[in-house]
């Protein structure tokens, strides 16, 4: 995709256009300074507002100016962290001008690609407010999709730890929890933006637009609830992993203690027979096959002790 594309819907069909015009959707993906200046001058927008969404630390907000409205929200994104796929959030800028809508983002995003690929039905770039709300709605559903993906990853970790717990599982679980923290923070900030949109009198809205905005609010709240639920579940999974590790350690210690007890019997008896003591004090010392008899007694005692320990489940690893 080009760094700056222009689209417009005609008869519900999205097509790429060559010139700016009424009903145009201008898509800016990681624009250069010169491209940002060109758009800022063309539509009389402050350059800082055009570049705002390119700052990862930019907070979500609504800014209404005389000839344009700037909306910045956080959208989910995938990045490589510690050689693993991780989820984070990045800003998406939406600028409403007189007859166009401009979207600005630091990278390509499935939130916008869904519209370009025709996955979203019945949207029109000419209906700016409704189109913006459809973008926000798609953003909420994308959050929910990634949340379900993270929950499936957590389920796989739970299945693995039933057999063997590895350091990688602990790291993966921590990564998932960090991702949920990012999502929760961004969704709450987006919720504030949506609440402001419902109250702004300077932004003209039609009744059907307000209904769609209500749907966006519902989906955003649902995403927040899903995030909290999954955080609680991951917290429980982490406690489960800690319990499993402790139980396995306790079982290993009990097994080693049981082996030590079993091995102590032949050690003590052989130690006694190894002392420099007269043979008359040593049972079976002068008896034919005395060594074999003593070994048999040691074996029987060891077996009896092992059976007792097994019944007490001390020989279970």
Language-model features, listed with the residues they occupy:
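Long amphipathic alpha-helical coiled-coil segments
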Residues: 197-210, 236-246
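Hydrophobic alpha-helical transmembrane segments and their immediately adjacent juxtamembrane loops
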Residues: 221-317
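Peripheral, non-transmembrane regulatory/ligand-interaction domains of membrane transport proteins
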Residues: 4-199, 205-206, 212-215, 219-226, ...
